[in-house]
Curated annotation (Swiss-Prot):
All copies of domain BRCT, residue ranges: 604-684
Binding site for Zn(2+): C421, C424, C439, C444
Alphabetically ordered keywords of this record: DNA damage, DNA repair, DNA replication, Ligase, Magnesium, Manganese, Metal-binding, NAD, Zinc
Name of the protein: DNA ligase
Transmembrane segments annotated in the record for this chain: none
Enzyme nomenclature, EC number: 6.5.1.2
Any GO CC annotation of this UniProt entry: cytosol
UniProt function note: DNA ligase that catalyzes the formation of phosphodiester linkages between 5'-phosphoryl and 3'-hydroxyl groups in double-stranded DNA using NAD as a coenzyme and as the energy source for the reaction. It is essential for DNA replication and repair of damaged DNA.
Listed cofactors: Mg(2+); Mn(2+)
InterPro entries the UniProt entry points to: BRCT_dom, BRCT_dom_sf, DisA/LigA_HHH, DNA_ligase, DNA_ligase_AS, DNA_ligase_CS, DNAligase_adenylation, DNAligase_N
Gene that specifies this protein: ligA
Length: 684
């Protein structure tokens, strides 16, 4: 079943319905991303995330004017660099972000992607096919051939230092066969046999067993004690580097061969095809072989084989344009719906969830699945007692497929849509044009809880140690009722919480105190204004410089800011018009929470590149593209991925393609790498 089948066809949506769905999808994906990357506790399977992400991409393509600047499709989630995370692992900033791959679920979608890629590349491409290993991404840095650092993907911008743990994985070389300085990336996974042995041992010891090999690998790699990691028998495959020039190769298939020569573990199942029509045979082959492989796979990765073309195609801020992942169709099982519950999110959206008899799907025990919204529930007509098909979209998120009507109990009744909020009992509102049912009571306990969790999260105020369980305890003990109460907490109050010793209390108070000094874009994100995420908050902070300026700005002024728009401006204005918000802002100011925009460096506005729209193309010698882009942005430039009439400057390396041709047609100034060095007087 194609994951897209759950959604209303885009062509049948009204503009207002599309707008509402885009907003709700963005909220859901942001929440799920936080759970996955920050809290290591996802509430939905990967398949559900992938399906909703693909839906958001399609909606934004159909309605580009509705795409929000802070959309999950427009950025890799980012956070501030801090010394350690809640586990005690040191944070590592990735100089080149570790991007996710775009997902497709059918051969036709692969063929469609091939058409776009061929058009952008200017010619038919050969592709390197690789198995998509079901593990977690790893970055390995070598200097003069010696392993000096290993880090997890994290949120794509910041990962965790797991060097000592990785050194216990025998397959990963500590010293390369050549003294190269290079960063490579790959996958850490747990073989099926090792996973079975580990779970048997844990079961015998009375410990909780792991749901699947990926979770086991992730938990094993992120141990504070390398001795524990060593006992888990992890494995690895290496498949990528951004430094192909170091290897002296021209194709992705050659990259894999050079990795073998250097001593890296490389999966031997890759295959080069001349055209995308050949991909079906490869997919069919490994669909059959999948269950008999000694490791888990959840799809096939397709990569442009020509590295020069890869470089030319580049990346969006979220995904590479030169590669895509085909996800295997989800596994299905039959189960019985025993209950339908309703939960309230941060923005007041009330979501139905099916509670079912537990079943195993793709190695995971599943007993809950979101029913998304009242319209979806009524369209599916899911009733308590129904037998339903359950699958994992993209092998990740549990989803109810079909109701088996012939098995429906005679007394099964259509499930009523609630009239009152399950948390605060306020009357629910179904806003015209929206699919969501909302609680609009600002004092709703569920919304307050979710708002506090969001306020403390990594992308917001980044209060380490203030997770969902702590927030729940603080609320249940009446130690806090609203956001500003966090800044009045004392160590003695925190010691009354379960599992909170003096040190834990001291650490949390220190984390709360540190958050007072955050630059104001974090506070803007943390306030939870509908549609305003981290990226939009940064734009607003840079423009207004102070929270009070934003609070007092009119909707028209806000809407004129590049990348904001009228919908977000109206939401911001509506938010600050609230008396309770005005009171909250005053309280935060009284608690000395910083309201100012703190720039990381002073930009010399006289430098040649300041305020210019710049595009990079071609192969560079002295710089990598990410390094040059970072330098330009630090010095006030706006770096774009495509040439347009608004482009001020094209910086061209060697082996350039269509961007140079387009720049020349538009009369845009073009300089080379040496010109850049001369103008900037910059050293890498």
């Amino acid at each position: 079943m194609n994951p897209a089948d759950q959604f209303t066809p885009i062509e049948d949506l009204t503009f207002t319905q599309a707008q509402a769905e885009i907003r709700d999808l963005s909220d859901e994906l942001t929440k799920w991303g936080r759970e996955y990357y920050e809290e290591d506790n996802p509430s939905v399977e990967d398949y559900v995330y992938d399906a909703h992400y693909a839906r958001l991409v399609a909606l934004e393509k159909a309605y580009p004017s509705l795409a929000m600047p802070d959309s999950p499709t427009q950025h890799v989630a980012a956070g501030n660099q801090t010394k350690n995370d809640s586990r005690g692992l040191q944070k590592v900033v990735h100089p080149v972000p570790m991007l996710s791959l775009g997902d497709v679920f059918s051969i036709q979608e692969l063929l469609d992607w091939d058409l776009v890629t061929t058009k952008n590349a200017g010619s038919q491409q050969k592709y390197n096919l690789e198995l998509k290993i079901d593990g977690l991404a790893i970055s390995l840095r070598y200097e003069n051939g010696r392993l000096i650092q290993a880090s997890t993907r994290g949120d794509g911008s910041i990962g965790e230092n797991v060097t000592d743990n990785v050194k216990t994985i025998t397959e990963i070389p500590k010293v390369l066969n050549e003294p190269l300085t290079i960063e490579v990336r790959g996958e850490i996974y747990m073989r099926k046999e090792a996973f079975a042995d580990l779970n048997q041992q844990r079961d015998e010891e009375g410990k909780t067993i792991f749901a699947n090999p990926r979770n086991a690998a992730a938990g094993s790699l992120r141990q504070l004690d390398p001795k524990i990691t060593a006992k888990r028998h992890l494995s690895s495959f290496i498949y990528y580097t951004a430094q192909n020039d170091v290897l002296g190769v021209n194709t992705q298939s050659d990259v894999l061969e050079r990795f073998r020569q250097l001593g890296f573990p490389v999966n031997s199942s890759n295959k080069v095809i001349d055209r995308m029509t050949e991909v079906k045979d490869y997919i069919d082959e490994y669909t059959i072989k999948r269950d008999n492989l000694p490791y888990g796979i959840d799809g096939v990765v397709v990569k442009v084989n020509d590295l020069d073309v890869e470089n030319e195609l580049g990346n969006t801020v979220k995904i590479p344009r030169w590669s895509i992942a085909y996800k295997f169709p989800p596994e299905e099982a039959l189960t019985v719906v025993r209950d339908i519950t309703w939960t309230v999110g941060r923005t007041g959206v009330v979501t139905p969830t099916a509670i079912m008899d537990p079943v195993f799907l793709a190695g995971t025990k599943v007993k809950r699945a979101s029913l998304h919204n009242p319209d979806y529930l009524q369209e599916k007509d899911v009733r308590i007692g129904d037998t339903v098909t359950l699958h994992k979209a993209g092998d990740i998120i549990p989803e109810v497929g079909q109701v088996i009507l012939k098995k429906r109990p005679a007394d099964a009744q259509a499930y009523p849509i609630p009239v009152y909020c399950p948390s605060c009992k306020s009357k629910l509102v179904h806003v015209q044009g929206e699919v969501a049912l909302r609680c609009i009571n600002p004092e709703c306990p569920a919304q307050i809880k979710e708002g506090l969790i969001h306020f403390a999260s990594r992308n917001a105020m980044n209060i380490d140690g203030l997770g969902p369980r702590v927030v729940e305890q603080l609320l249940s003990k009446n130690l806090i009722r609203k956001i500003s109460d966090l800044y009045a907490l004392t160590e003695s109050q925190l010691t009354t919480l379960d599992k909170f010793a003096d040190l834990s209390s001291k650490n949390l108070i220190q984390a709360i105190d540190r958050s007072r000094q955050n630059s104001v874009e974090r506070l803007i994100t943390a306030l939870g204004i509908r549609g305003v995420g981290a990226k939009a908050a940064k734009v607003l902070a840079a423009h207004f410089k102070n929270l009070r300026n934003l609070q007092n700005a009119g909707a028209e002024e806000i809407a004129e800011i590049d990348g904001v728009g009228q919908v977000m401006a109206d939401a911001i204005r509506q938010y600050f018009n609230s008396e309770s918000v005005a009171s909250l802002i005053n309280e935060l100011e009284n608690f000395q929470v910083n309201f100012d925009y703190l720039t990381t460096s002073t930009v010399d506005e006289k430098n040649y590149f300041f305020n210019k729209r710049i595009v990079l193309t071609g192969k560079l010698i002295h710089w990598t593209r990410p390094q040059m882009q970072a330098w330009l942005e630090e010095h006030g430039a706006n770096v774009s991925s495509s040439v347009s009439s608004k482009t001020d400057l094209l910086i061209a390396g060697s082996d350039v393609g269509s961007k140079l041709e387009r720049a020349n047609k538009l009369g845009i100034k073009v300089i080379n790498e040496q010109d850049f060095i001369n103008l900037s007087n910059a050293k890498k």
